[in-house]
Amino acid sequence: MIDYDPTRPKWVQIYEVVRARIESGEYPPNHLISEVQMESEFHVARVTIRKVTAQLREDGLIITTPGMGSFVASKKAPGND
């Protein structure tokens, strides 16, 4: 669990933690991003976690496959946009 800053939305703070884990390699490509696990770890409601995953998806950090779940996206090679 993290110490939340009451002046900022919780979902933004959780997003920053998860993004940092992805960027550091703690969550490698194809790692399952479990909403249930994040709910438990961060002690927040599912709707909050869904905001986090929506932003991660929009930023291209995760890919969601219906019926399978959300997974860390493979990193792009430098210069390949």
Question: Can you name each region flagged by the protein language model?
Answer:
Residues 1-44, 50-54, 58-63, 68, ...:
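Extreme N-terminal segment that seeds HTH/winged-HTH DNA-binding domains in transcriptional regulators
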